[in-house]
């Protein structure tokens, strides 16, 4: 091969390599430019549907040990069920008949919806036997937006302890839709991302508290009824959000205190009991907030203490009622110091 031919061949090879590099570079830049202006895929959290909740095992045995199951449990027949053990799913009640659940040291930590959901029209009764402690937690996002949720009437009773943590997005602690909630007993502790105890829906439901020790710490309203609230007994401590726009108690209808002990605290909204209430009460809207962890006392004009408690959050509204209140003037003390706030009862 002649020397000139070799040189020409080398030049052709070099030019081919350069041309290839240029073509690859232009293609890559054009592809990047197209990707730059392509719409980004948004990660959307899927709301749990009824079909998702219905998936699982249908169990209608009298004794149910949650440790034996790795999916939701569906109860479809009326009757009384003894529940024990723990799992990370949901206990679904789907019956038109009355269902009673006896919680015997149960632990439910649901990943996608309510820990206990009654999705049909039958009444749900949750019994907390004496000497037991049960804990319910939920998270995710679903139409069953209470850690305990019921489409039918809901009754909670017993002498045991029940801890409820409503962690769903905008989730309630205990909730119904267009139906009543009745609490007849138990030591019940509720924390929630929204309302603690909620009877919602277009028609609402009446919340009735006859007995029990109830503690509520909510990021929304402590107790919210789209209908009525009646407190006949027990001890109720309810704290609404400290951020603003929420109350210890909020109802669309009547609000009666006929007995028991009630402490309802909030950030700015205040709803006082109806005058038809059979038990005396005092309510305050303060001009300056009382700080979290302050010790608060209510005393009469003779310096007798009526009630005392610790504020779990900053607050500016208070409703207080117990059997010691009668005609007279009452004063708020904070950390042992008498404040400017007083209220007279006729």
Please provide the spans of the model-predicted regions:
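A composition-driven surface/loop motif
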Residues: 3-346
